[in-house]
Swiss-Prot record:
<keyword id="KW-0540">Nuclease</keyword>
<dbReference type="GO" id="GO:0009307">
    <property type="term" value="P:DNA restriction-modification system"/>
</dbReference>
<protein>
    <recommendedName>
        <fullName>Type II restriction enzyme MboII</fullName>
        <ecNumber>3.1.21.4</ecNumber>
    </recommendedName>
</protein>
<keyword id="KW-0460">Magnesium</keyword>
<dbReference type="GO" id="GO:0009036">
    <property type="term" value="F:type II site-specific deoxyribonuclease activity"/>
</dbReference>
<keyword id="KW-0680">Restriction system</keyword>
<keyword id="KW-0378">Hydrolase</keyword>
<keyword id="KW-0255">Endonuclease</keyword>
Amino acid sequence: MKNYVSNINLGNSSLKFIDERLQSENYRGIHLSQHNRYDLPKLIDILTLLNKHAPNQSLMQIRTTDISKRPQNIPEEQSYAEFCNEAKSLTNIGTQDAMRKNLFVDFARMGLINRYNDKKVLTDPFKRGVTKYVALSDMGVKLIDPKLDILSKNLIFSKSLNKLLTGFVEDVLSLLTNSDLKEISFDEFMLFVSAMNCNFNFSISTEQCESLIKEYRLLSRVQKNAVIDTLKSELIPDNFNGDKKDKRDYHNWANENQQIWTLFENIPFFIMEKDSRKLILITSDVDLSKYSKSKMKRSQQAKNDYFKHHKVNKIKGYELDHIIPLLEAESVDEYRYLDNWLNLLYIDGKTHAIKSQSGSKYYIFTFDDNDYNQIYFLDTQGDKLSINNDDTALFDKNKVPKIYEYNQNFINAKTS
């Protein structure tokens, strides 16, 4: 194994992890198209224009061939061409090719638009296929509602972004919620956080990520600078032989993470300190006087209440998990409802990873009527995760009916 940074401080586990990560051709971790340079305001502008050209969630026909192969639009694509021209003029992104091949792919995976094939059948946003029509989804309509306040828009964006990143936003929230880190730097985000619960061989749990970040913080300022400077000078494509998968590119890696990092600015659970390049979890001990997110303040009460009511102790390898993710909240009231001990469960790292990687689709709580030690997390299609007390979770079985009722109250509540 090639050592890039381990020699800067022999025995430091965080540096060893970085070198191990760089052995993988997937070292960059989570990937977003670098062409998709959008933020929440641009997203709202584009979806508003889509609503203008395809009102009332009607289907708009899009081009299915690259402009280089067929420069002209057919008559049925006129609305699409006009829409793309207006989007490009307003936001500086969204050519006809980029819109259908990049932006619409993201927006569909975020749940903000629906895509349809040539038979007008809804397609799976995470599977490849030819798309001929698009339309705003119910969530997309809600996001562009001019009567909706900005905080509620940010909450919807958070939920949508978590879907796009297959649970990554929730993982970051879990990392800062269940540890004493309180904040993370961009370098820590790129080197360690982006490896959480990914589908590559260097995947780490939130607990392992916390440990690596703390180990990294034991380095002196000079050593940390040496790590980044070394990676910048060593990870240059021309320094490597072979094809693309054999090469390493620091700037490409950093740019991809910067794109994801920037999107966190619109997530109301965090504060982005641009000057210091830090991402901070909003908690009761953060001074929010200079921010507009005071309604999203979190306290330790829900966590403390869980351990008090369930009479369990903290154990290595387990972490508190929101049964219904906080990212499901679409208003401050919903957020406060979900930030409660009755919406928490102390589960093991493996179960948390499965739940997170699924995009947190398992949020319906149920249990075995004959054995309260056996509970389940279901998704809307009936698939389930089996949870056993004193094994994959730690809880007081007598609290199970109350947790179930609390869960059902939210799930069955009518939404506007």
